[in-house]
Amino acid sequence: EASELGGLLCFDMYNIRYITSTNIGEWARDKLSRFCLLPRGDEPIMWDFGSAAKHHELYCPWMGGGRSRAGISLLRGAVAPEAGRAEDVARKIKRELEMRGLAKAPLGVDVIELPIYAALQKEGIAGVDGQQLMQAARRIKTPDEIVLLNTAAMMVDAPYEKLYRAMRPGVRENEMVALAAHTLYSMGSEDVEGVNAIAGERCSPHPHIFSDRVLRPGDPAYYDIIHSYMGYRTCYYRSFAVGSASPAMVDAYKRCREYLDVAIAMMKPGITTADIASMWPRAQEFGFPDEEACFGLQYGHGVGLSVWEQPVISRLVSLDHPVTIEAGMVIALETFWPASDGWSAARIEEEVLVTETGHEVITRFPAETLLVAGAPYWTGTGPLNAIRELEPGLGGAGAGAP
């Protein structure tokens, strides 16, 4: 109502879920097949995937009164243009806007296929950016959303416990991904969007994807677990060492944690994203030519129905375009630091709820110091050091307390 828009047309599944409280599964996330219209001053109208429309009419009473309808778009180009689906969608939208006297007002659109956008223009409908309005609406979480985000984070504690116990020489990154995914689906996750499992020399630079690399003694290993419970997501990194940690890795972890803790300590209503980003290191301080080249490594972002929501915190965008932090935001803060050995690195992330008086960290798997996973090794004189160089001649190997 605060905008100039006559309505919002949404194909983004997360926006549709926010507006209509309907969902047909994560398989539909990237299909652009479903669409909804939220007219100014009225209730939403949903055009759903075939029989899903009838299902929602029966079981979603808030979508009653003929507002849950069947309607098919272009399925990201899978339907041939000559079938006329783009024109059909445009006519449907125009008819609803005209009935409410809104056809002359700008229509906010989030994501759309170009043939549908062109068809709307031919019908005289001016499409404008509606994604910013939706992001603004989703920025502050309701109490129910906060409960769901907390529950989703709680669920990730379990795969981290299992990963910690399972990591040892000989297992592969993809096996760790399978373990995390199995654990979450067994607990009721509706979608494990991604498990980044990164080990050894793959840690720096961060590749953002797992492989079948075998874990070896002394490897660093970090994970990001992204999943959805009742629509609400996590972004939750943890770093480990396998069997033992090198002094360089321990130092990198301390540095990574320090940058993260500084950001967490600042989180309260009234500060800005620029305040936080300014406390993080410049790209050149950790081996990158500019902020775009290291985007996402010293990073903050809202978490909700999608894993990246407003506000975004980065030296790339926040210093010149600050956003004020408000109570009710849930923000993931993630930091990275490469080790001096040239291949190890640490990566940690915490999800933070901004409260009226400060903040609450909702990701609870231990991360204040580097955890060493795997069975301890024993020598003839006692336990092998948990902090040791991979090459004994460099010092740090042998028995004794860590």
Where on the chain are the PLM-derived regions?
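Active-site neighborhoods and metal-handling regions in enzymes and metal-associated proteins
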Residues: 1-402
